[in-house]
Regions:
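AMP-forming adenylation/ATP pyrophosphatase catalytic core
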Residues: 127-134, 138-139, 144-359
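ATP-dependent adenylation/nucleotidyltransferase module used to activate substrates
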Residues: 1-160, 171, 180-181
Length: 359
């Protein structure tokens, strides 16, 4: 048994991570299940919503672990989650961006912290229910992150932060499967969560009212301010600049005779600039905090396909290195509502080249 590889299964209580645990156990790994406690629902002023980290989720994960006859633990990472994810989420909104906290959770919690926990317990791999694939390049030896075989479920966009060490010690057993097959396996195993709904994207804001969450969490109040047009003329009043994101049309409460969209925000002046949809299109962006996966670094311009938001189809582009580790991404065609704080992820076929944060 000592030579049998060991796997720590990150179990959310959902069907995907449960089937991932099932598959690893079937493959002969020494398995241990663990659920992360990232926050207390009562601390966020929320109850009655389906979120991860709920008592029901922990119960479901524990039940599946019991069925699989594997040890199970709940790990308390509430302090780390507050510092690394929630505070960055709030600061990104307060400085005019639109964050993607799922990426930071993957970076700091699901892989960094969980891999350390696995090693402390003599386990070799972290296993999650993400839809993506990992392979090693036979020529370079680098570990590659690849898209899931079934594109509609692919989650490689939110996994671009994984390091070479993390990729070498991570397994995604669902990368070649579709959702119906996964639910069928859960039914076969008689798991209690075989038909459980998928969790919310932002688990700690289950009602979608992120400004309400920020006000409760910080004790701040985000004041009203002016809507202005692209010439600087005041055209109305808004209810706090943090409430609006680039490209937004709904919920502005403006009647200007033609549709207008959020084009920019000045957080110091608390103004929100609105204009016609044509103002939203641009061909270039600059990104920082870049993580390269298929290459060690970018030294020359490279042709790629790029995604500047999760649900966007990949677009042909050229990426160029800039000083201080930043990159410029120039799209072949203008892109709508590129937004600070979101991720841009670069692809070469089904391989993730790398990704970073839009500045």
């Amino acid at each position: 048994m000592e030579n049998t590889p060991g796997a720590l299964i990150a179990m959310s209580g959902g069907v995907d991570s449960s089937v991932a645990a099932y598959l690893m156990k079937q493959a002969g790994y020494r398995c241990m299940g663990a659920t992360m406690r990232l926050y207390q629902n009562e601390d966020l002023g929320q109850c009655g919503f389906h979120t991860c980290c709920s008592a029901k989720d922990v119960e479901d994960a524990a039940d599946v672990a019991f069925q699989l006859d594997i040890p199970f633990e709940v790990i308390n990472y509430t302090d780390e989650f507050r510092e690394k994810v929630i505070k960055k989420f709030i600061s990104t909104y307060e400085t005019g961006g639109t964050p993607n906290p799922c990426i930071d959770c993957n970076r700091y919690m699901k892989f960094d912290k969980m891999l350390a926990f696995a090693r402390e317990h003599g386990l070799d791999y972290v296993v999650t229910g993400h839809y993506a694939r990992i392979e090693q390049d036979p020529d370079t030896g680098r570990w590659l992150l690849k898209k899931a075989l079934y594109g509609e479920k692919d989650q490689s966009y939110v996994l671009y932060v994984l390091t070479q060490d993390e990729l070498a010690h991570t397994r995604f057993p669902l990368g070649g499967m579709d959702k119906p097959s996964i639910r069928a396996l859960a039914e076969k195993a008689d798991f209690c969560n075989a038909h459980k709904h998928d969790s919310q994207d932002i688990c700690f804001v289950p009602d979608g009212d992120y400004v309400g969450f920020m006000e409760r969490y910080t004790g701040k109040f985000y004041p009203d301010g002016d809507f202005i047009d692209t010439t600087g003329k005041v055209v109305g009043r808004h209810h706090g600049a943090v409430r609006y994101t680039n490209g937004q049309r709904k919920g502005l409460g403006l009647a200007l005779g033609a549709p207008v969209y959020v084009c920019d925000k000045d957080m110091e002046k608390n103004t929100v600039t609105v204009g016609p949809e044509s103002e939203l299109f641009t061909t270039t962006l600059v990104a920082g905090d870049f993580n390269w996966i298929s290459i060690p670094e970018l030294t020359a311009p490279m042709r790629v396909k790029a995604k500047a938001r999760y649900r966007q189809p990949e677009q042909p582009a050229t990426v160029r290195p800039l000083p201080d580790g930043k990159v410029e991404v120039e799209f072949d065609e203008p892109q709508r509502a590129i937004t600070r704080g979101q991720a841009v992820v670069l692809y070469d076929g089904d391989v993730v080249v790398g990704g970073g944060t839009i500045l």
